[in-house]
Amino acid sequence: MKHTYTLLCLFLLSGVVVADISGAALTSDGDTIAISGMKVRLNGIDTPERNQTCRNAGVTWKCGYEVTETLRGWLDTKEVRCLGDRKDRYGRLIADCFVDGYNVNARLVYEGLALAYRKYSKKYIPEEDKARAAKRGLWAGEFVTPWDWRRGKRLEPDY
């Protein structure tokens, strides 16, 4: 019993969060949702920022807004289940989320709407490779990676 109690204390002190939450989701942006008030950051992916623009065939489009709205459409009125094992520095649960039997994180990357966030996970690299090869979503044109966009990098002007 003493050994079990010690292990439990060590586990709790380690900061590991194991969560399985389900419910209606509110979409904050392309890779962040909230379920029952808990903010959830989709694991292993990064999407364009809400105000980010991309270019396809010389036409600039609001890719960040479009990705957010696409995710909202996928999740709207659906039961979303998220499985997470840790929180980020903003207190968001880092999780893989599922709706209608598919992995939302994987689908965003496969459709070319998100990038595999290699800095934190290698999980969705195969989906990104397929999206890039098929020139789906972001891969059909020009874009700045979300992590570079956050650092101030922008597309070169298209003259």
Segments and roles (model prediction):
Residues 3-5, 15-159:
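Small beta-barrel nucleic-acid-binding modules, primarily SNase/OB-fold domains
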Residues 6-10:
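Sec-dependent N-terminal signal peptides
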